[in-house]
Structures are given as C-alpha cells and as structure tokens.
A protein has these predicted regions:
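Short secondary-structure transition/capping segments
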Residues: 54, 128-133
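Specificity-determining recognition surfaces
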Residues: 1-25, 147-149
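A glycine-rich helix N-cap at a beta->alpha junction
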Residues: 67-72, 133-149
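Glycine/small-residue-rich phosphate/adenosyl-binding loop
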Residues: 25, 31, 35-101
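Small-aliphatic-rich amphipathic alpha-helix that forms the alpha element of a beta-alpha
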Residues: 33, 76, 88-130
Length: 149
C-alpha cells in the first residue's frame, strides 16, 4: 500500500476486535510519529501507550464518556510539552505538531491494516494517565486496534 492508498483507505473506526496489537507493529506506528516534522524540530510530543483496561476506561471517561475508547486493546495518548512556543503567525506550535505526528501514525496503522480513531473531545482536567510526562498536556489522541475489514 502506498501513502495515497492509505489516505484513501483510512477512516475512523469505533468497533474493535479484542486481538492485541503486536509490539512490532506498535513500534512501526510510533516510529512514524517520531519521524513527523515539527516546528524548529522541537518534537514537543510524548506518546503514552495505554494497554491497561482501567487506564483505558479512565481515558474513555475523560473523552466525554465515549465508551468505545476503553474497548480498544491499545490507546496511544498523545501528550505535548506546552512551553508556549509560538509560530510567527501567532499560533502555538504544539497542537499542529502533535496533529501531524498523529496523522503519520494513523497512516502507518492503516498500512498495517489496523484501524484508528482520532479522539479530539477530551477533558484534560480529569488526568486519566498517571504518571504522565512531566509538564505535559494530554492532547487529541488515537485509538489503535485490529478492525473488521
């Protein structure tokens, strides 16, 4: 599958198989995020791989009670160092940088025949990941799972 095929094929998936995602595939997906461009190559993101069912349920609660979040075997919680770095246009860098990295990850997952779903509705005040990376803010995240194709 080439990148254009992955773009055409990728869609939001909210029903998952309970089959675990192999570490090798997860590492490929995380590497795709790591290789994403960022403002001044700051790489302000931190990715937390969540497999623990209780933590996934807390993430689901923090994601406006979207229960499907807790049903996936893996959630990649995207966190960002929020030091206030701003582009010349006045926009904070981290939301754009994290979004680019997550998009790279969703396309890599699609190539591996895994389903993903962006989770943008999120209440950071609930702090479902403990401990989370120091001074990091939890940002939109993705769910990762085998899906029914």
């Amino acid at each position: 599958m080439d990148v254009l095929d992955a773009i055409k094929t990728r869609n939001s998936v909210r029903e998952y198989l309970s089959k675990p995602v192999e570490d090798e595939k997860l590492n490929v997906i995380l590497e795709a995020g790591r290789l994403a461009p960022s403002a001044s190559n700051r790489q302000e993101w931190r990715f937390v791989v969540v497999r623990n069912p209780q933590t996934r349920r807390r993430l689901a609660d923090a994601a406006n009670s979207q229960t499907f979040v807790g049903q996936a075997p893996v959630v990649i919680a995207a966190c960002a160092e929020t030091d206030g770095h701003v582009m010349r246009c006045g926009q904070l860098c981290y939301p754009i940088d994290v979004a680019i990295a997550l998009d790279h990850m969703t396309l890599a997952a699609t190539e591996l025949r895994l389903g993903t779903c962006w989770i943008g509705a999120f209440n950071e005040q609930k702090e479902p990941i403990n401990p989370k990376p120091t001074s990091a803010l939890i940002t939109p995240s993705i769910i990762l799972s085998w899906v029914f194709y």
